[in-house]
Amino acid sequence: MSRKDKQVHLSKLAELLGRSHEVRGRSRHVHMTPPDEDLLWLESWQAERLAMTYGDLHAQDRYRPAVKFFLSDIYGAKDFSRRDDDVRRVYPLMSRVLSEEAIASITLAMDLHAMSQELDEEMVRVLRQEMEVAGELTPAAYAEAYRRVGRIEDRQRQIELVCELGAVLDAVVPNPMLYTAVRLAHGPAHLMGFGELQDFVERGFVAFRHMRGADVFLDAIYQREMTLHHALREGQHPAQWYVPPQEMVVGDYARP
């Protein structure tokens, strides 16, 4: 990755910080209840669905760390605002300490999170205000809200971003020099105030290095999520998509 590529990622990261801040501010003015509670309510349900969908991979030692990384650091039901604030605070220092690959990983993760925030915000608005769902979130209610929100291209892009992030991590770990450079940044990153970001990158690299090749893992994510996405779009009953992966009829969706 060239210096120019690094600057492109840094510029994109600055844009994403503003986007994330805007979404958080807008959310606080839209919902009657505290937005974090509403969003965590939805995200917790989604995390449970993902844990079930990828339970077969989690059961395999080769893929378990990568599944945990995606469930906790990418799709986790937790507030990422502190991480976003840390990026904003130390942004001027990042280019001097973090490698190009680390910045690329953070940028893709932030892009994915910003898009997920916007989609989740829309889901919460539909569920809470239009559908008046107040108690337990059911697969049927989720499916209906998903269809009402629409944003088909964004949903597909969300899946693609997950796979792009995985591909970046997978490309770095076989290179001992790049992998070592990322690990050597651990001390300086913590001293300069963005250790949480560095730890995020390291967790991803360690998980993907353990996997020894991510094609099967990333293909499974793309095929399963695209299959579920199209099932939801087409109005299928939840029984046809909210199922364990071994019972899922996976469509023919090739990862780009």
Residue ranges and their predicted role:
Residues 2-256:
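Extended, well-ordered protein cores
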